[in-house]
C-alpha cells in the first residue's frame, strides 16, 4: 500500500521535497499541500524553479487543486494545522515544512487532525527524536517516535563528517563555520529583522549569523554533546553551501590518513548517497542538484599534529530534501 503524504508549507523545502520524491520514484503518494496562497501560484512555483529548472512533468490547476502528470493533489489554505482534514484524506505522514510549527505541541496538531506521523523539516524542540540519515536513523522506533525532526541541512552535512572523524580519531572539541547560501529568512534589501545581520541585503553581503547545526550534533551523536560549536556566513548564492570543520582529535594524524578514512566511509554501504568523496577542484555551482548530504572535498583537508580541518559541500535545498524523502520512506516502512 502506498503511503499517503500531506505537505504543510509549500516553500523551498516543500517544493523540493515534492520534486525529490518524483526524482527518486519514491513509493509515496502526495495527496495534499497546505499553504496560504493560491493554487495557481503554488503550481507555477512547482513547475518553474530558478535553481532546479523546469519540471518535465505536466503541472496544471483544476478545480482549485494541482494536477501533476494526471495525479490530483488537493490544495488547502488553512492557517491552523488543527483544522486540516488529514483523517478524512487518509494522510499517514505530514511533512511539516512551514518553519512555524517546530515545537512538538504545535506539530502534535497534525496528529490530532488524523495523521500518524509528523516529519519536521527543521531543528525542532521537544520532538520525539531528531534523525540524521546515515548517522542515527537506526534508532527510529515507530512505537515511541511520532514527531520526528530531520535536523537542519547543515547538521545533515556535518553529521556524517563528525561521525567518521570521531569514530576514527576521537574528537575532543571543534568549531565549525558553514559558508551558506542565503535563504528567505534574510532580507532582499536592508530592512528591519530581529537579527540585525540578517536585516541586511542578502545578495550583496557576506552575512555572519547563527547556526544551531554544531550544537545540534549532540542530538544525533550524543558522545559529541557540548564538544562542537560554530556559526554561519551567509553568502550571495541561491543554494550550494560548504561546512568547514576544525577539530582537535585524540592523536596526531596526517592529511592522507584523514582522507583515507573519509574515502572508506564514502564507499561503505552505510553512507551510500549520503556521504560522497571528491578530489576534483570544485566550486559551489558544481554541487547544485547533488542529492548527497555531505560531499567531502579531499583537496581542502589540512592537518597540523592533532588539529584537523575538513570541508564538505552540500546543496542545502536538494540534498536536504532528498534526505527528507529517505526519512519518509524509513518511517513509511514501519507504519503499523
Protein language model annotation of sequence segments:
Residues 167, 171-238:
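Acidic, glycine-rich segments within the central catalytic cores of soluble metabolic enzymes
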Amino acid at each position: 500500500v502506498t503511503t499517503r503524504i500531506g505537505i504543510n508549507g509549500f516553500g523551498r523545502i516543500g517544493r523540493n521535497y515534492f520534486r525529490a520524491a518524483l526524482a527518486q520514484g519514491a513509493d509515496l503518494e502526495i495527496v495534499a499541500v497546505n499553504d496560504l496562497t493560491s493554487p495557481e501560484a503554488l503550481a507555477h512555483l512547482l513547475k518553474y524553479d530558478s535553481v532546479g529548472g523546469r519540471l518535465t512533468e505536466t503541472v496544471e490547476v483544476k478545480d482549485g487543486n494541482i494536477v501533476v502528470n494526471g495525479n490530483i493533489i488537493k490544495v488547502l489554505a488553512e492557517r491552523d494545522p488543527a483544522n486540516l482534514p488529514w483523517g478524512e484524506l487518509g494522510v499517514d505522514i505530514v511533512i511539516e515544512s512551514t518553519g512555524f510549527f517546530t515545537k512538538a505541541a504545535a506539530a502534535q496538531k497534525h496528529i490530532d487532525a488524523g495523521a500518524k506521523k509528523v516529519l519536521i523539516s527543521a531543528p525542532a524542540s521537544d520532538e520525539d527524536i531528531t534523525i540524521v540519515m546515515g548517522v542515527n536513523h537506526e534508532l527510529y522506533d515507530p512505537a515511541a517516535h511520532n514527531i520526528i525532526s530531520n535536523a537542519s541541512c547543515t547538521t545533515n552535512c556535518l553529521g556524517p563528517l563528525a561521525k567518521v572523524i570521531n569514530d576514527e580519531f576521537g574528537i575532543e572539541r571543534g568549531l565549525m563555520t558553514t559558508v551558506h547560501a542565503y535563504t528567505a529568512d534574510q532580507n532582499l534589501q536592508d530592512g528591519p529583522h530581529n537579527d540585525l545581520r540578517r536585516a541586511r541585503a542578502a545578495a550583496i553581503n557576506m552575512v555572519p549569523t547563527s547556526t544551531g547545526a554544531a550544537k545540534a550534533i549532540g542530538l544525533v551523536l550524543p558522545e559529541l554533546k557540548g564538544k562542537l560549536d560554530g556559526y554561519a556566513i551567509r553568502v550571495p548564492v541561491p543554494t550550494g553551501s560548504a561546512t568547514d570543520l576544525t577539530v582537535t582529535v585524540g592523536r596526531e594524524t596526517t592529511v592522507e590518513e584523514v582522507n583515507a578514512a573519509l574515502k572508506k566511509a564514502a564507499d561503505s554501504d552505510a553512507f551510500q548517497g549520503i556521504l560522497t568523496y571528491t578530489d576534483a577542484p570544485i566550486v559551489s555551482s558544481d554541487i547544485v542538484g547533488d542529492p548527497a548530504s555531505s560531499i567531502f572535498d579531499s583537496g581542502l583537508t589540512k592537518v597540523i599534529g592533532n588539529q584537523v580541518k575538513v570541508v564538505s559541500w552540500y546543496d542545502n535545498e536538494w540534498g536536504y530534501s532528498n534526505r527528507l524523502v529517505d526519512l519518509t520512506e524509513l518511517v513509511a516502512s514501519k507504519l503499523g
